[in-house]
């Protein structure tokens, strides 16, 4: 979705849990670097990702879902991230290329709102099979979500569906 506060992170977690319950190997990459909420939604906010000089190992939830988020590597989750676009997109790329995800059937990427640097970087550098948009039943929100749908289509990424949340 192009808009914040519509439930993208919550839907990402719910989809990941459902896929894991069906026996799939699932990972969640929290690409919302300036507003990461995935660790809290999985109740792993006190956990920390560990790593070596070569790789970062994601935190695994009780459901067996592998999770990588900036809040799993910073000391305190309420630290402000005051970085420019290139630094943020660099972290997102690192979470894709430098994290040992192992064998996954699905990697769910929780995106920040908008059609800016991070969504563009993700769509250009990660082999995405499709996107699911999350919206709420408000005209202004629908217009903003349409921009994200158009962006995905311009990037030749299939829109698998739209979840209308809070309806």
Predicted regions and their residues:
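Short amphipathic alpha-helical face segments that pack within enzyme cores
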Residues: 14, 33, 87-91, 147
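Short acidic, glycine/serine/threonine-rich loops at helix termini
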Residues: 11, 39-41, 79-81, 120, ...
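Walker A/P-loop phosphate-binding motif and the immediately C-terminal alpha-helix
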Residues: 1-30, 149
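Phosphate-binding loop that captures ATP/GTP phosphates
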Residues: 22-77, 89
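Conserved catalytic-core segment of NTP-binding enzymes
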Residues: 105-167
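Conserved, well-folded catalytic cores of nucleic-acid-processing
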Residues: 22, 40-45, 71, 94-102, ...
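Phosphate-binding/switch loop-helix module in NTP-utilizing enzymes
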Residues: 72-122
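Residue-level signature of catalytic and energy-coupling elements of molecular machines
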Residues: 4, 30, 38, 68, ...
């Amino acid at each position: 979705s192009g808009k914040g506060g519509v439930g993208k992170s919550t839907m990402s977690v719910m989809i990941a849990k459902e896929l894991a319950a069906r026996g799939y190997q699932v990972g969640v990459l929290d690409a919302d670097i300036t507003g990461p909420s995935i660790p809290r939604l999985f109740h792993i906010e006190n956990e920390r990702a560990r790593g070596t000089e070569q790789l970062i190992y994601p935190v695994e939830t009780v459901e067996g879902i592998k999770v990588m988020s900036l809040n799993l590597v910073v000391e305190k989750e309420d630290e402000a991230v005051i970085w420019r676009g290139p630094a943020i997109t660099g972290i997102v790329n690192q979470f894709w290329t430098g994290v040992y995800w192992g064998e996954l059937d699905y990697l769910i990427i929780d995106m920040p709102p908008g059609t800016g640097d991070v969504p563009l970087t993700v769509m250009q550098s990660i082999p995405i099979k499709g996107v699911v948009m999350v919206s709420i039943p408000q005209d202004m929100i629908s217009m903003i979500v349409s921009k994200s749908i158009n962006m995905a289509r311009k990037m030749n990424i299939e829109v698998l569906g739209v979840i209308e949340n809070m309806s």
